[in-house]
Amino acid sequence: MARKCEICGKGPQFGNRVSHSNRKTRHKFNPNIQSVRIEINGVSRKVKICTSCLRSLKKSV
């Protein structure tokens, strides 16, 4: 589970890169995953979460 958020489950998405001549090549968009130490149920644990979840966690604290 390298590129998956442990809170919301957000993972990679696939799409196309489109050149000026309108050629399309496949491309993978990875979520912005950060490794953060969070206290869960009184236990400090290192989790991999996306930055949107990190922002919502910081807002709730």
Swiss-Prot record:
Family: Belongs to the bacterial ribosomal protein bL28 family.
Pfam family, one: Ribosomal_L28
An MF annotation (GO) of this entry: structural constituent of ribosome
Matches recorded under InterPro entries: Bacterial_rp_bL28, Ribosomal_bL28, Ribosomal_bL28/bL31-like_sf, Ribosomal_bL28_bact-type, Ribosomal_bL28_sf
GO cellular-component term (any): ribosome
Entry's Gene Ontology BP terms: translation
Protein name: Large ribosomal subunit protein bL28
UniProt keyword list: Ribonucleoprotein, Ribosomal protein
Keyword Transferase in record: no
SUPFAM superfamilies (UniProt xref): L28p-like (SSF143800)
